Amino acid sequence: MSQLVYFSSSSENTQRFIERLGMPAVRIPLNERERIQVDEPYILIVPSYGGGGTAGAVPRQVIRFLNDEHNRALLRGVIASGNRNFGEAYGRAGDVIARKCGVPWLYRFELMGTQSDIENVRKGVTEFWQRQPQNA
């Protein structure tokens, strides 16, 4: 199975979700000067920022990570977290990334996610990779 790549702010909500998920994952560094490059296809798990529009919805660190053409080329799908208090903007980073990168928006969950979210993502990620061609 290919990997998960995620970003978590200092609130650590996404980090806690990843820990509960119990699947191999690589973290995009919080420090903007640190860079990572992936070597296999991955699903991105990302929090949504801001309270409304698309501007600012995607964390800067994630934008920098995806601006690396090599990293962007290996992106296969996106899962977003958010806060339902923001209405239509809930999980907006997933929508923005999916649209701009031409990949499916696979799931969204609120804050740290529920046990049901953990189970849905675990099952969904496994099934997603099983449907992908071997060299994708």
From Swiss-Prot:
GO terms for biological process: protein modification process. SUPFAM superfamilies: Flavoproteins (SSF52218). Pfam families: Flavodoxin_NdrI. One of its GO terms (molecular function) is FMN binding. It comes from the Bacteria. InterPro entries: Flavoprotein-like_sf, RNR_Ib_NrdI_bac, RNR_NrdI. Belongs to the NrdI family. Probably involved in ribonucleotide reductase function. This is Protein NrdI.
